[in-house]
A protein has these predicted regions:
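Gly/Pro-rich hinge or "lid" segments in bacterial periplasmic/extracellular proteins
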Residues: 73-77, 167-194, 198-277, 402, ...
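Aromatic- and charge-enriched surface segment that lines or borders ligand/interaction sites
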Residues: 91-156, 196, 291, 343-345
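Alpha-helical secondary-structure segments
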Residues: 38, 125-133, 192-202, 240-241, ...
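Extracellular/periplasmic solute-recognition and catalytic clefts
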Residues: 245-256, 265, 277-340, 365
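Long beta-strand-rich cores associated with HINT superfamily self-processing modules
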Residues: 559-587
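Structural transition elements
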Residues: 242, 340, 370-407, 425-430
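Extracytoplasmic/peripheral linker and loop segments enriched in polar/acidic and small residues
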Residues: 30, 351, 363-366, 447-458, ...
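N-terminal lobe/hinge region of extracytoplasmic solute-binding protein
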Residues: 40-100, 237
């Protein structure tokens, strides 16, 4: 995964460092088995069904129980996390081994044998289970935020998804019947151990797409439930090293060994700890940090290290600042909101608000310049298609409220009042308050409302009905690319392709510009990644001209573990350590 292409190599090579000790992964000798890994944090995942996962926390959890065809290996060297590696696939397809056709539109993937579901009795994972997983991406109840990747890539996926959208989203039987009676031309099980994919056009990043957690195999039992429903969440099935033995929504998870998992069938994961306990409901990063330092907990679930603690921890081997080139957070405008006479649907209003933001204040909130840099583009540095630009400069990154006021007056919309939901964990409240102060200096009032992390992503900003009803006007989500390396589409397409806007879409503001959509298509069909990069740059420029979002920070991830944690290897796409490789001592 994440093949480094021309023009990107220099960017990625700069992302190998970390501040703090943090690299003692192999310093404590041979791994020991046993013990309970204790993880504490704030909010539940927005989706537990692997088909629907869309956040870094959900990605990290899914890795423990839902395997994909390919994946990446956790490492504290950023470069080592980039390559695509086999997971349930037996080998990497190539033109040399005959698994990629001469036209580069046919991929044959052969499955690793011996992988089983945690069913009673155990049952082999087959190619048909992967076909089911791909079909579920477009289910009408809880569709995948990443379905657009495959609609634009796989033959027949668009037609399949259109038909699936007409099925009753509350009827598990009807959805199951649709899947049985229809098929995606581009995803076929040749036999129990062989998958054949047919692409609309050659796609140099197709293997990257097959590492994404929502492409995991789905057991036949999942057809009994409405996807990601409460009932489904209580009946997850595993083919990874752990299984979810107990789940209390919004409160806790208990993961225990999956007895059907075998190390010799899994090249990416290990299994050392006996149990993994995840305790939720703790919004204060200070409280979480205190528990880890006192040895009451081992890892934070969804909280970075508190800003106030960073100076004293810089030389602590348990602390690290890990590179996660991302847009975290960014300010998104609900372009569909009817509030203020539909003001946010007007480009001139959004352009005016670009000048409001004091990025220097936000950098202080998250931990200073070693943790975050100001961001002015849709695509952050270290990602394919990045080109430095600053269309809306302000003195010392501190904002220009006078210009913001002037442009709002000129646009005919002074005195806006904007509904602003914010996440309650980590420093998100402080970020929201800082942005509210910036807007107030421009004469814009904000109505702040606390919104738990799970609800924030799962419903508030990802539900089109909420957007069209004006239940929110601005929000500050974050975006970590789904993969690194040859990853141009992992930012522009999910966040700004207006053609895939709908339930669970990550194009939260409903932005839709035919010019940008056309540039996305051009990039996806470009013969080489280097050519695609030019189209992504053009799309970035157009999106910023439209002021669809306000990029705020390119932020690294601060992370800390307890004294008893060893083999702490980082996964940038999950913004956390790989739970399956950790082991514990009694220290």
């Amino acid at each position: 995964m994440f093949k480094v292409t021309a023009g990107l190599t220099g960017l990625v090579l700069g992302l190998t460092g970390c501040t703090g000790g943090g690299d003692d992964a192999s310093a404590a000798g041979e791994p020991r088995d046993g013990g309970t890994l204790r993880i504490v944090g704030s909010s539940d995942v927005e989706h537990l069904d692997p088909t629907s996962v869309a956040s870094v926390g959900a990605y990290g959890l899914a890795r423990t129980f839902a395997r994909t065809l390919f994946g990446t290996r956790a490492s504290n060297d950023f470069q080592e996390t980039i390559s695509v590696r086999p997971d349930m696939a037996a080998r990497i397809p190539s033109r040399e081994n005959g698994d990629i056709g001469k036209d580069r539109r046919t991929y044959t993937v052969r499955l690793r044998k011996g992988v089983q579901w945690s069913t009673s009795p155990p049952r082999p994972v087959t190619a048909h289970d992967f076909v089911r997983g791909f079909e579920r991406l477009c289910n009408p109840a809880s569709p995948s935020a990443g379905k657009g990747y495959f609609i634009s890539t796989l033959k027949g996926m668009e037609e399949f998804c259109k038909g699936f959208g007409d099925v009753d989203a509350k009827d598990a039987g009807a959805m199951s019947a649709y899947q049985r009676e229809h098929e995606v031309e581009g995803v076929r099980a040749k036999d129990d151990h062989t998958l054949v994919f047919k692409l609309r056009e050659p796609a140099s990043d197709f293997l990257n797409l097959l590492t994404l957690p929502y492409t995991a195999a789905a057991p036949e039992e999942y057809d009994r439930y409405v996807p990601d429903s409460a009932e489904h969440r209580q009946n997850t099935i595993s083919n990874g090293p752990y299984r979810i033995s107990n789940y209390e929504p919004g409160m806790s998870y208990l993961l225990t060994h999956n007895p059907t998992w075998r190390q010799d069938t899994d090249p990416l994961r290990e299994r050392h700890v006996e149990k993994i306990e995840i305790t939720l409901g703790q919004d204060s990063p200070e409280t979480v940090q205190q528990q880890i330092e006192q040895g009451v907990a081992d890892l934070a679930w969804d909280q970075p290290v508190p800003t106030s603690a960073i100076p004293r921890l810089r030389d602590d081997d348990r602390f690290a600042i890990r590179e996660t080139p991302s847009s975290s957070p960014y300010l998104v405008f609900n372009t569909l909101s009817p509030s203020n006479g539909g003001a946010l649907g007007k480009r001139e209003v959004r352009q005016a608000l670009q000048y409001a933001v004091d990025r220097s204040a936000l950098i202080k909130i998250v931990g200073g310049p070693s943790v975050a840099k100001p961001l002015h583009t849709v695509i952050p540095p270290g990602n394919s298609g990045y080109a430095p630009s600053n269309r809306y400069p302000t003195p010392n990154e501190s904002g220009n409220p006078a210009k913001c006021r002037e442009l709002l007056e000129k646009a005919g919309h002074p005195g806006l009042t904007l509904k602003f939901p914010y996440r309650t964990n980590s420093v998100h409240k402080l970020i929201a308050q800082s942005l509210a102060e910036n807007l107030d200096a421009c004469g814009v009032k904000t109505e702040l409302s606390a919104d738990s992390g799970g609800a924030f992503y799962a419903g508030t900003i990802s539900t089109p009905a909420n957007a069209r009803a004006g239940e929110w006007d601005i929000a500050a989500p974050g975006w970590t690319p789904d993969w690194y390396g040859n990853n141009g589409r992992s930012i522009i397409q999910p966040l700004f392709d207006g053609r895939t806007y709908g339930q669970n879409s990550t194009n939260y503001g409903g932005y839709d510009n035919p010019e940008v959509n056309a540039l996305i298509d051009a990039a996806l069909t470009a013969p080489e990644p280097s050519h695609a990069g030019g189209y992504w740059q053009q799309a970035d420029k157009k999106i910023m001209e439209d002021a669809a979002i306000v990029p705020l920070l390119n932020r690294s991830h601060t992370i800390f573990h307890s004294t008893r944690v060893h083999s702490a290897f980082f996964l940038p796409t999950t913004a956390g350590y790989d739970y399956t490789r950790l082991w514990l001592t009694d220290d």
